[in-house]
Structures are given as structure tokens and as C-alpha cells.
Amino acid sequence: MSAAQGLEYIISLTDQISAPLKGVMKSIDDLGKRGEAAMKKIGLGVAGIVGAGFALKSALDPAIELNRALGEVHSLGVADDALEKLSKTALNFSSQYGESAVDFVRSSYDIQSAIAGLNGNELAEFTQTSNLLAKGTKASAATITNYMGTMYGIFAEDAAKLGNANWVNKIAGQTALAVKMFKTSGDGMSAAFTSLGAAAKAAKIDVAEQFGVLGNLQATMSGSEAGTKYKAFLAGVSGAQKELGLSFVDTNGDMLDMVTILNKIKGKFGDTLDVAQAAKLKKAFGSDQAVDLIKLLLPKTKELKNNIADIAKVSDTKALAQMARSMVDPWSRLSQIITGVKTAIGGEILKKLDPIMHKVADLGQEFIDWLKTYKNIARWIGYAVGALIGFTGLTAALTLMSGIISAIGVAFSFLASPIMLVTAAIVGLGIFIYKFRDEFMQFISGFIQGFKAASVSLDPLFNAFSLVWGALQKIGATIGRIIGLFGGASDSAYSFQQFGIDLGYALGVVFNTVLDAVELVAQAFNFVADVFSIVVNSIIDGWQAVLTLWDSSAPIDSFLKIGDALGNIFLNAFQGIVNAFVKMLNFIIEKANSLPGINIPLIPEWKDNPTAQALSPALATGVSDGSNFSLSDSLQPQLNSMPQGSVTKTLTQNRTEQRTVNYGGVTINSNNSEEIWQKLRNKEQLAAG
């Protein structure tokens, strides 16, 4: 086979293979595009479904959470009507005080667990009062819920007598007053009663007295420590009677109140205790904790009695509600109102959706049972799902392959592009130059030497430039001599130097005029500012004078004093305005006086006048009357007429010139330009002779 035949064979084979390959590539590309479109549609569909689901869940979440909390309470056996009341109370409390309705309902779970036998609306009342107390005393709902459970366990008999709702309102109100009175907190009071327990109640001590004692003790110690000391005191009262020779019980054998016991101890030992007395009390009561209580409360028996009386008067939550409202954050309240609206709407929707969701869940459960029964069907369903997932993965793989092929094509297109070729050429040239850098340096060095060797041929050009430069120097010297002739042509002619001086002076005058105009505008602005400040300050001073001098018991004298004060204030204001205007006029006069031939006297400012003070009490500030504003004849501005050109003449006469000329090393000083030029000509003639 010849070379030509082999070449024809290769070309033919290439043509036959290229077309099918192009078709395959096009098919792969089309398949990739269809796969990409399908994946986009699937992604958009899934995103839409998920987004709609999340939006619906977000809208229903508040209602779902509230229903869950109500379900927890319902598990304790609470009736449906009580749950409905609890739900409404929770939403109202949330919107009024900015607290979570869900937390409100969940706190009712703890209350119902701790207090058995709450019926009807009592659970909602207990929960609302507990959360109100938590809000007003800066405690958590969980802490106050436990506190209410503890208090109910101690004072269950009182609750039965008053009724659960009335009792909880009384306890909450007294707790709030104690917290406010003794600067403690709901947490501290809860810890105090938790430590005390039922010891005081067993001694038949009223709850108001317990609040008073525990509150006073918390001024110097924690709530739990206060409860411990009070409990130790109660435990030692019975044995201390015999040791101290005092009786701490009444005729019925019941323990006396704390104030009476303290007064008996005070009568025996005084207001304060020394070391020996404290030791004796410790022996009597049996503990240091009891002695600490006595030391703290012994000087405050009168105050303690008043505190107990004030606490005993409280039977509701009016003061507590006011405390809670003062702590409401309006933004939290607005947020909870929005949540409440979503809860109310969502609750009504859930009433319709819950049965449907239960049906769907039941169907799902039945479908699971059916699949467990017919395992073959479950297996084939699994195969179908697996195949669907596999086809989806295959589509994604084809899309990936199409993208890879496209990326490879783009890469080869870039490699074959003019930009890449130029870049490659530059890089190659740089590598070539770096590789043969020594040879290039030798070549450049030789080139420079050869160019320098050829510089002889440039001498004619340099000579031509020298001739031109010499001609220019001759022309410049000639022009200099011509200019010199003007110096002696006329005595009245200015030299070029004098012309520059006059031109600079004229420009300076113009510039000063512009600056004066700007300064005048600034003075006018300052005048307006002064007037504004004077007027406003006068109004303020006048109002303050009215408020200060008015006496309802002596209205006539008050009016006279106010009139005098207002007169002085407004006369001072008028004086300030006049002086500000005079300052601006004097500024204009000063600028006019800077011109030759003008001498206008300045206008005097309005100052205090003793004569005016003697003439009228109303002019106490020294303001003179209108007659004093006129100027005397000697002070009147005198405007003298000036002949034409007198300003220029005056400027010329007032100008002193000093000229200095250095010629050939000789310095000539003179005020006469003609004299300088004459001396120069004499020097030249002497040199020429």
C-alpha cells in the first residue's frame, strides 16, 4: 500500500467515525439537559412542598404547643370545661403581661399535681395568681408554683375556711407586700417558708406574723437562713420559759406573739445583749440561731408590730397586679399578642384538622398492618421504590457526565483561544530569555558600544544646536538693551518693576475688598444670631420671673414686682439689640475709614446711665431714654469733598520707595529711578573712555 493510499484510508476512516461520534455526543448532551431539567423540576416541587409544610406548621405551632400543654393537664383528670377556662385565662394573661401562655398552662400542671381537689375555675384562679406573683416578685413560675404548693400544704385549713380562690389571692397579696416591704424577692420568701415548714403554724402563729418575722430577718440574711433561725427560736421557746423565769404562753397554753415575747425579753435584758446575756439566752433557747433572731429583732419590736399589722390587712391582689403591670415590657406584650392571635386561629383550625389527621394516622397504621400481612407486596413495593431511586440517581449521573464533558470542552476551547496562545507565547519568551540571559546581556552590551562608536556622525547636529543657542543669546541681549532705554525716557514713566508693584497693590486692594464683603456678611449673620439669642433669653427670663415672683397671698405686690422685672428684662433686651446693630455699623465705618481722606467717628454703644437710674425705678438696669441716642455735633460724621484723582495722588505721596541696583559688583541705593539710571550711564562712559 502506497503512502497516498494509506492517507486516503485514514481520512475515510476519520470521516466515517466522526459523524457517529458527533451523534453520540449530541445524544449524551441532550440527555444531560433533559436530566438537568427533570432534576430542577423535582427540586422545585420538593422545595414547594417542604416550604408549604413548614409555613403551615409555623402558623399552627403556637396552637399545637398550647394543645400539648393542655393535654398534659388533662392527663391529671381535669375536666374539659376547666381546661377551656384555663386556656382562655392563659391567653388573657399572656396578652396582658407579655408572658407565654404555654408556660402558664404547664405551671398549672404542677399546681394540680401539688394541690388535690381543685374544682371548676379554681385551677385557673390558682394558676393566674401564681403567675401574677411570679411576675410581680421577679421569680420564675416554677419557683412560685412550688411555693404555692408548700403554702397550701401548711395552711390547708385556712384555705378550706376561706375557699381556695380567696385564700390563694390573700397569700399572693401578702407575699407581694412582704417582698416590697422588706426588699426581698419571691425566691427568698419561698426559700424561707420551705425552711420554716409548719413549725410556726403548729404553734398557731398567724401567717401575717410569719411574713413579718421572716421578712425582717431577710434584711441581713438569705431566706433559707431566716427560716432556719425562726424554726430554732420556736423550738426553744417552751424550754426557755423555765430557764429565764418568763412565761411565753397565754391562758390557753398557746404561744404568745413574737412582739410580746420580745418585749418580755427586753424587759429582763434591755434593748441590747452583752456576752453574758447572750450566753444565758443560748442556754435557755438551746441554739445560736435563736439568739441571732433575738439580737436582730429586739431593737425593732415597734417596727415589727407595724409590719405585721400592715400585712394582715391585705386580702387581695390589687397591689400585686400593679407591681406586675409596672414590669411589663410592651414589646414582649406585643409579641405575645401576635402569638395569641395565631394560637386562637390555629386552635380553631386544629379542631377541624385533628380528626382528619387522626384518620390519616389510622389509615397509615392500617397500611402498616396490611404490609406486615402481605409481605410479598411490601417487598415488590420496596423494589419499585428502589428502582425509582436508582433511575433518579442514573439521571443525576448522566447530568454529571454531561457537565463534565462540557467542562472538558470549555477547557480545550480555552487552551486553543488566542488569549491562551498569547499567554503561552509570553511565558515561552520569558523562559527563553531567562535560559539565555547571559548571551542577551553580552549582545546588549556590544550594541551599546557600537552605538557609542557611531556618535562622531552626530557632531554636525550638535554644532547646529550650538549656533542656534548662540543666536538666541544675542537676541536676548539686544532686547535687554532696548528695555534699558525706557528707563531714562521720561521722569513720569514707571519702570517694569514699579509697574509690577502697582499691579500687585491694585490686586491686593481688590482682594481686601472681597474679604471685607465676606466679613460684612459674617457680621450681618452674627447680628441676626445675637438678636435671636437676646429675644429667646428674654422670653425665658420673663417666664422664670413670673414663676418666681408670683405670690398668691399678695397679688398686687406680685404684679408690681413682675412688672418691674419684665421691664428690666425687656429694656436689657432692647439695649442688647441696639448695641448689636451699633457694632455692625461701626464695622462698616471702620472699613470706610481705611480709605484715604475719610475719617468718620464711631458710634458709641448704649451703656448704663446713672441719671436714668435716678429718674425712674423702672430703668434699674441702667437703660437711658431715647434722647440720649442723638450724637453731638462734634461726633457727627464729617464727609469732606475730595477733588478728582486725590486718592491716587495721596497714595502716591504717601508711598516711600527704596530702590537697590547691583551692577558689576557695585551696589547703588536711591529713591529716584532717574538717579540710578544716570549713575549707570556714567559708569559705562567711564569704562568706555
Curated annotation (Swiss-Prot):
Domain of life: Viruses
Leader sequence segment: none
Keyword DNA damage recorded: no
Keyword Acyltransferase found: no
InterPro entries: Phage_tape_meas
Keywords: Viral release from host cell, Viral tail assembly
Family: Belongs to the P2likevirus tape measure protein family.
Name assigned to this protein: Probable tape measure protein
